[in-house]
Amino acid sequence: DFKRIRYPVHVILTALSMFYLGKNSFRNIALILRTVMNVLVSHTTISNWCTNFAPMFQNMALQLIPALNFNSDEWHADETVVKIQGKKYYLWLILDSETRFVLGFHLDRHRDSPQAFTILEAVKDLGSPRAIVSDRYFAYQMPVKTLHGVQHIRVESFHDDITNNLIECFNKQFKAWYKTKQGFSSFSSANNLISMFIF
């Protein structure tokens, strides 16, 4: 709720933009705000903004979903690694080929079929693609067949006509942003910050 915040909304949005679109730490953002905008705000406060406003912006993004058409040619599935308190977690993602919208994500300690089932189950009511594209990792085979009943295209980046480059490019953008964060402090914080970046 912006009403309880003592800083102007444009300052908060500027800080959020620098964090999610740039490669700035909370301390750097505080320094930039002080130098450029003459606004004194602590790095801790900026961190709290990023964590607390993530659910609000995610809800706003979710409200847009019914107006979008995800019955596209392909949905792309992939997973990438993040660290939470130094421990390895897998970020599972589904991306629509036409809108470039991330349909959903799932954060888990494991990388196996149950996690693929979880993410594909979460997005199955959003539309009906003609095919779901993934790499050749076996975990997607049964969930795609069972939950969606569409063609499953398993690709190797350099050998197939259809590639998974779309979601791999997204993962590169995510990794560039994530690298500046040096991992996440908690599972809850990771979910909030990732959802803010995605949505």
Where are the regions that the model predicts?
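Short, basic interhelical loop/turn and adjoining N-cap
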Residues: 4, 34-47
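Active-site beta-loop-alpha junctions of metal-dependent nucleic acid enzymes
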Residues: 5-6, 52, 105-126
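Two-metal-ion RNase H-like nuclease active-site motif
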Residues: 68-84, 93-95
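Acidic/histidine-rich, metal-coordinating catalytic segments
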Residues: 128-141
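Short, basic alpha-helical nucleic acid-contact segments in DNA-binding proteins
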Residues: 40, 48-70
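Charged alpha-helix within mobile-element recombinases
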Residues: 167-199
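Basic, short loop/linker segments at the boundary and entry of helix-turn-helix/winged-helix-like folds
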Residues: 1-21, 41
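Short conserved beta-strand segments at catalytic cores or DNA/RNA-binding microdomains
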Residues: 20-23, 85-109, 120, 170
